Amino acid sequence: MKSIRKPALVALVAAFTASCPAQASPQGWQTASDIGVYSLMAVSIGLPLAGKDTQGALQAVVSIGAASLIATGLKETFPKTRPDGSDRKSFPSGHTSNAFAAAASLAERQGLAVGIPAFAVAGFVGLARVEGKKHYWSDVAVGAGIGSLAGFLITRKHPEARQSALYPWGDSKSAGFTYATRF
């Protein structure tokens, strides 16, 4: 698993770089959000498959699917006009929910070394949806929550993923916390 972390980081950085709009127009931001979310979904499924972790790939697919179904259901239940007025499917952001589901799945299965850059790309997707006039910040925040919950609730840690813990300690004179991680 460790041998595929570097290519994963390269893929995430490439996704982020490619999704940065060359022109700060609503269409440029929309294109950037598409590239970001589809790249994240591909990495969240492809990275486990590259490491022969079919369970991890399946968990990523189910996480993204669950987030997408919930977001779509809410769009139909609570129609809200988009900032650009194009339709009434603003709430919540489906792009953001899918991006955060993929990022949470990567973080849970691969560890923080892959998860943190994945969440950075997911955050960029949310920003791009707002800048592209497709969503309000509230739509993006709810989408991020849906995706994160789906990813973290459905995905299980890989046995080789870096693990960390926060331990409380104390005695009669002092108290504190100890953070431990395995490299």
Residue ranges and their predicted role:
Residues L40-L47:
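Hydrophobic core of alpha-helical transmembrane segments in multi-pass integral membrane proteins
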